[in-house]
Amino acid sequence: MSVALDVKNNSVEKTKVLVRGTITPGNIVFQKELDVNAHTTEQVKFDKRYFPQLCIDQPRLWWPNGYGDPNLYHCKFEVMVDGRVSETKDVSFGIKKYSYDKEGNTFHIYINDIPVFVKGANWGMSEYMLRCRGAEYDTKVRLHKEMNFNMIRNWLGSVTDDEFYEACDKYGIMVWMIFG
C-alpha cells in the first residue's frame, strides 16, 4: 500500500515538519520529517518500499453489499511543527482488488477475484440539485443498501462531496463515474 498527502506551509519561512500516520485496525505507524519552503505545498509520499509496515498481511477486505462486509481502515494523519500538532486529518479507506473483462462482449466486474452482479441506480443532476449534505448522504446511500443495491452510477460526475463517497464505502456501494 502507498499513501500520499499534501502539506502546505502558510508561514513566511521554511519550516521543518513531522508527518505521522496511524492506521487502525493494526496500529500501523509511519512518519517522515521534511522541510517545507515558505508559501509552498509539498506532497509527502509513504511507499511500502521504504515503509515496510505498510505491507498489510491478510488485510480485512472491502466487499460490495451482498458479498461480505465493507471492512474499512482508518488513518489519522498528524502534521507536527516544533513538537506540537499543527493539523490533523482522518481518512477511511477499504482494501480491495478490482478487475474487469469484456469476455463474450459482456462487461464483467470482479472484486477480490469474485464476479459481482451489479445492482444499482443512477444519481445525476437532480440529486445534485437537491443539495444533500452530511447525514443526508448517509441516509440515502443506506437506503440503496437496504434495497440490495451494490452500485450507484454517478451520472456526469455530478456528486463530488466527500460525505457521499464515505457513505458508499461504509455501506458497500460501488460508484460508477460517468463523464460527458
Where are these regions (language model features)?
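N-terminal catalytic cores of secreted or lumenal carbohydrate-active enzymes
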Residues: 156-180
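Secreted/periplasmic carbohydrate-active enzymes, especially glycoside hydrolases
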Residues: 1-155, 159, 170-171
